[in-house]
Amino acid sequence: MGISEFYEDWLTRSGFVETKSSPSYCPAGKLYLAPKEVACGYYWVYGEKNLFDIKIHDFYFFEDSFISLNTPECLSITYYDSVSGEELTPYRRLTAGCVKSFYGGHEAYKAIFHKNIPVRSVGIEVFPAYYENYLRER
């Protein structure tokens, strides 16, 4: 499963709905509308083959929300412009202005996001095909 398909599957199972592109987001990626029952806002993702993806979160939850996601193997780096919550494995606070990273593919990413606080972030995930093969070949 490719990067784009992974996020499309996870987001739609979580209630997000793919929507038309907006002038606020690059049309090269896919834009998803948050599930209206639990959140308000958008999730944008652009995947480049099996090399990397770029994600933008811009939504908030109506209630404190627990997220559990088994990511493919990758190095994930995210800057949070706005957030309030906790990463659970290992425990770390999520606060505005922080940069968080994790190495995915081994255990589920688990976090709690607090209600009515915007989750605004930009992240990149770099996959083994990029840092083990693509860069070496260049």
Q: Where do the model's predicted regions map?
A:
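N-terminal regulatory/effector-sensing and dimerization cores
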Residues: K30-R138
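General N-terminal leader/first-domain-start detector
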Residues: M1-Y42, G47-F52
